[in-house]
Amino acid sequence: MSHIDTHSAHGPTGPGLESPPPHPAAGGHDAPPPVSPRRRRRHLSPLNERRWRNFRRNGRAFWSLVIFAVLFVLSLFAEFIANDRPIVVSYDGGIYMPVFNFYPETAFGGDFRTEAVYSDIEVQCLIRTGGLEDCFYEPDRLIAEGAVAEGAEGGWMIWPPIPYSYDTINDLGGAAPSAPDAQHLLGTDDTARDVAARVIYGFRLSILFTLIVTVLTSIIGIVAGAVQGFFGGWTDLIFQRIIEVWVSTPSLYVIIILFAILGRSFWLLVFVTVLFGWPALVGVVRAEFLRARNFEYVRAARALGVSNWTIMFRHMLPNAMVATVTMLPFIITGTISTLASLDFLGFGLPSSAPSLGELTLQAKQNLQAPWLGFTAFFTFAIMLSLLIFIFEGIRDAFDPRKTFQ
């Protein structure tokens, strides 16, 4: 009888039947609200959270990342920081954006259909006065008096903090290069271009070049090293012989020949650098996969029928990331040095490109202008130091001895 009462009190149970879950209020505690899949995806895994905490504890690496991120983001908006075109122009009640669009001089009451030279005093007078024809004769007086054409509205311009682009040739009134002054904070180079503007654009160019090359070389190197280490045998042997022949190819001669045939360009230089840079990671990744291929979890995955590519890149690659991340600082600094060296030798980007290597070459050719050498040196020193500190912190954060202590 007691057995029947107990059975009826708790509802039907038995094989294949489960009692209904208790009401949240029955136990005296509210059940936690369900977590949506979108919110779950936002959170890092416990392992990555430990790595992030370890990175945050490294003050030098964390603040280097902050400073570098700020500098890089600012350089992405270089056109709004250093440009020989105004950011916004108001002319006769209309708004123009010369940073993004082409406007002929006729759009502001001028005579030419070529692009307006906004630094010319005549063009500035036309914009400010609403298109007075006397701007071609007495622009300074009309601007000083604030004259406005009849029936028109006075205009205005908002300039970037540095009113010169990286390729703007300035009228110095003297010999170039010129020393730093109020108009050119870091002076000008030997073709009268503003050094500060070229440093801003050159920093962006160097970092973008380095990021593109590093990502592409890392992908190719990791895949090649993983295939060699995982499969071993003849696959490893053949790949190793190919790599030995490939790395013995004189890359500088190949670059000179390709540039002589195809001309110098940014993407061609990226292609050639990736072409000869991917073997840098192969040896490290190959060694990690050779070491891990006989571990128990790899054998278990094979026994369960997991595909080779899933084992390689979902299970084995995370364990090889420490050694891979350790090599990244060398790849990044090497890529920056490669770009600067090629530009210094004249085999890199076109001479008109805002390159830090070209600035270094100008410093060598103009020893009487020490500001060129100081600017190039401190730019390289700051950029490379920040990157090394950042990846040093990343390497420590990925170190299992610190992650699981």
What are these regions (language model features)?
Residues T188-Q405:
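Alpha-helical transmembrane segments of integral membrane proteins
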